[in-house]
Each structure stands twice: as C-alpha cells, then as structure tokens.
Design a protein with these regions (language model features):
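A short SAM/SAH-binding and catalytic strip from SAM-dependent methyltransferases
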Residues: 143-157, 180
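Conserved alpha-helix/loop element of class I SAM-dependent methyltransferases that forms part
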Residues: 41, 45-48, 52-76, 90
C-alpha cells in the first residue's frame, strides 16, 4: 500500500491542492473551515454586512431575483448557503410553498431561525447544516434551487453546481445571485476603493472583524466572470442559461434549467 498518496475528497479532488481564499492560496481541505470561521464571526451582523457591502442595494437585487424566478404556489425551494434565510423568506412570501435552507455554518442558521420565528410561514421552513457540495436530499426533489452571495465561498464550485442540478426535478430552475464583474472601468476603480479601503475599516468598527470583511472583498474579485460562470453551469448540465447584470455588473443573476 502506498502510504504517501495524497488525500482526496469525496469529489475526487486532491486535498493538498492550493485554492483561493480571497487573495491567499490555502490547502483545499482547509478552505471550508476557514470560510465557516469567517461567517461565524459575522453571523450576528450578517444582514448589516450585506448592507455595507452593497450600500443597501442587495435588497433590490434580491427583489430582482424573485421577480425573475416568479415563484409559484406549492413550489419547493432549496436555498444553498442560505444563511439567515433571507432568500427563503422572500420566496415563501411570494409563493406560499416550502423552503429548505442548507448552510455549512450552524451560527448562520441559528441567526436565521431566530429571524424567521415570528414570520407567519416559519413552519414551512427546514434548516440543515450541510455543504452545498454534498446536499443531503434526494435526486429530483426540488422545484427551484438558489444560492445568493454564497457560490464564491464554496471550495468546489463545480461540485455545488452538479449537486444543484442533481436535486432539481425535470423542468426545475437554478438561480445564482452573486457579486460579479463590473463592465465600466470608471465604476470599477471607485468600487475597488470602497471594497479594499473603506469596507474593512467599517467591518472593524461595526463587527470588530476587519479581516473577515477584507476576505469577502477579495473573494468577489476572485470569482469567475459572468461568461465563465455560464460555461460552468453548462458543464454541470444546465440548459437555457442566461444572466442579468445588476448595477452595472456589481452583481449578476444567473439562471439555468434542468430540462429532463
């Protein structure tokens, strides 16, 4: 037996391989725990964090996601990296269906449960600590799958996309809302100043964690651009793939369908 062979993950990846964590390169098998630490740190102020990172515009982006998804009654949503339940709650408000929130971070889910407890549709929510790379749900069990501001934090994004495809019913739809790549250089320069100079300082003052906010800004720049993500979705099996830029590409919604 070869005792020196590299460890491998359930997805067949070499766990000793280096992968991006913001602008740093870290061992693949360390990233998930490092991301979990970041979100444990920011969980109590996560919604405020989104307000700071987007100047409050994330609320309009999430409305745009719901408008494009057009939820229908009795649909079942699986929201990956669902954190505090913001997307699931918006979905239920519009559809009256049900939602299953998946997140690797128990602190984020605890914040979500507390937030949802007084909502009229709290009983229609399920919460599960699990990775988007290994979703503990049956094949063809979801009508819709979403991931909002979470795919860039996933260690193996292709594995997460394939899992989203696996759990969708034929005719089901996947939507990803994520910070993306700005199309106008002038706006990009201003956004860099905000992200790398102002945001970490605000994070230190508001949440007491400058490093977490710096990582989040770096992770946005490391995320694939709009066309690259379309190609990844096609590789995972999705069809009729489209994207819409929001706020000149600061964020984008990607949509894909499982046809059979």
């Amino acid at each position: 037996m070869n005792q020196n062979r590299p460890a491998s993950s359930p997805t067949g990846k070499d766990e000793s391989e280096l992968i991006d964590f913001g602008y740093r390169q870290v061992p693949r098998n360390d990233k998930e725990a490092m991301v979990a630490d970041v979100f444990s740190s920011v969980a109590p102020s996560y919604d405020l964090m989104n307000d700071l990172m987007s100047a409050g515009i994330h609320r309009l982006w999430k409305d745009a996601l719901m408008d494009w998804m057009a939820p229908r009654p009795e649909q079942m949503l699986v929201d990956l990296a669902g954190g505090t339940g913001d997307i699931a709650l918006r979905f239920l408000k519009r559809s009256g269906g049900s939602a299953h929130i998946i997140d690797i971070n128990a602190d984020m889910l605890a914040a979500g449960k507390k937030r949802a407890a007084l909502k009229p549709y709290a009983a229609q929510l399920q919460w599960t600590v699990a990775s988007a790379q290994a979703i503990p749900l049956d094949d063809k069990s979801a009508d819709r799958v979403t991931i909002a501001f979470g795919l860039r934090n996933v260690t193996d994004r292709m594995a997460a996309l394939r899992e989203a495809f696996r759990i969708l019913k034929p005719g089901g739809r996947f939507c990803c809302l994520e910070f993306s790549h700005i199309s106008q250089p002038q706006l990009s320069a201003l956004y860099d100043i905000w992200s790398f100079q102002a945001l970490p300082r605000i994070g230190r003052l508001v949440a007491g964690d400058e490093d977490a906010y710096r990582y989040l800004a770096e992770s946005i720049r490391q995320f694939p651009d709009q066309n690259t993500l379309m190609g990844m979705m096609a590789e995972a099996g999705f069809a009729q793939i489209r994207y819409r830029n929001l706020s000149q590409g600061i964020a984008a919604i990607h949509s894909g369908w499982k046809l059979d």
